[in-house]
């Protein structure tokens, strides 16, 4: 009997996302319920954005939640390497195999040619897609250009007529027309694979039997299925999970909700409660009880109990459930966990250098630095009263800084300050006009330790969370203001 093998394959390009944890949980439970194995693979082919720091944060977040893996980059295994960036030769081999079989081809089109192609198609009211012009090149010309070392990608051929039947474990058979599919790039000019080729090759070579992934990948499923057919491989069983949603039903995003697992750990949520809540996202226990452990979820796991309605990720409901878990702890364990959370040595070492020179007794630490240990802060609205800026301008400055911080890839003090300075300079203000607002929003106080140091230590999600709280305290941003300020954002360097 074939051993069930599932996997999670996150990209290490930022803080570990609750959506990653959600999909990891369901893959883990499915594998364990069937006596199988759960694998962790790292999709780090985006060399510009991928970092080992983000990779480690993924490991730490999943282990904090209680999700572990039998094979992965940090523990090894018989199917390694488990980082896609270390599997380049493997992808090159299989891409060339597709070319040799006539299922893929080199494409030498430049970015400018592709942009012009799309513009012409849009002008005609057509769906932008690759027009296949490289297929018209003779074998001799292709070889000449390859021999000359001309930059190129490898694209897959796709049918232009008919439909692809996608067998989904939740929805049954889903028909998707082939004319919606583009001639997907499989290998980029830098010699690294795109998601599609790497995904199929890795899942096959690692013996993955079932793939549970987010439903946002369902429209592109025909490309994956076609690749399995081209290679002559058995494809894994496919399951497209409903996406997590904000309370307004929009896709869960950091613009509306904190999305980092690290944020919830720092806020003092219990990992058991977090897993419990993620387990209730579109799934329920047979007896419908709300509070259950990871092992209880594994023991009772059945995909037939997954609901296709978009599950709502609501922090208030998560907080309520966390309260149930907290109150059920023996008081000794409650005290022990509180100590572990509040007096985390690594976190304390980040804070101590900024506090030590500002206090004369330990009792002065709490008033000065207590905001480091809080989730949100409750600043007095008077702290946002400004001699120079109107209330609307105060909100504008804070909103623009928040948006700039949302696009920040590397969370470092200098880059944080760069975001603030960019907004201030564009609005022809001084730093002294904006920094008191940041102090109030981030620390809840008129002054404290360096606010940019504090933002770096607190991290991106907690910083953005507090800025959003401050904006709500000041009345929020109207739809009209949001539209106008977003236009302004585009012109800020």
Curated annotation (Swiss-Prot):
A motif ('HIGH' region) lies at residues 10-20. ATP binds at residue 254. The keyword Phosphoprotein does not apply. It comes from the Bacteria. It is found in: Cytoplasm. Its EC number is 6.1.1.17. The keyword Aminoacyl-tRNA synthetase applies. It holds the Pfam family tRNA-synt_1c. Its main location: cytoplasm. One of its GO terms (molecular function) is tRNA binding. InterPro entries: aa-tRNA-synth_I_cd-bd, aa-tRNA-synth_I_codon-bd_sub2, aa-tRNA-synth_I_CS, aa_tRNA-synth_I_cd-bd_sf, Glu-tRNA-ligase_bac/mito, Glu/Gln-tRNA-synth, Glu/Gln-tRNA-synth_Ib_cat-dom, GluQ/Sye. A motif ('KMSKS' region) lies at residues 251-255. HAMAP family: Glu_tRNA_synth_type1. Catalyzes the attachment of glutamate to tRNA(Glu) in a two-step reaction: glutamate is first activated by ATP to form Glu-AMP and then transferred to the acceptor end of tRNA(Glu). Belongs to the class-I aminoacyl-tRNA synthetase family. Glutamate--tRNA ligase type 1 subfamily. Monomer. This is Glutamate--tRNA ligase. It comes from Pseudomonas syringae pv. syringae (strain B728a).
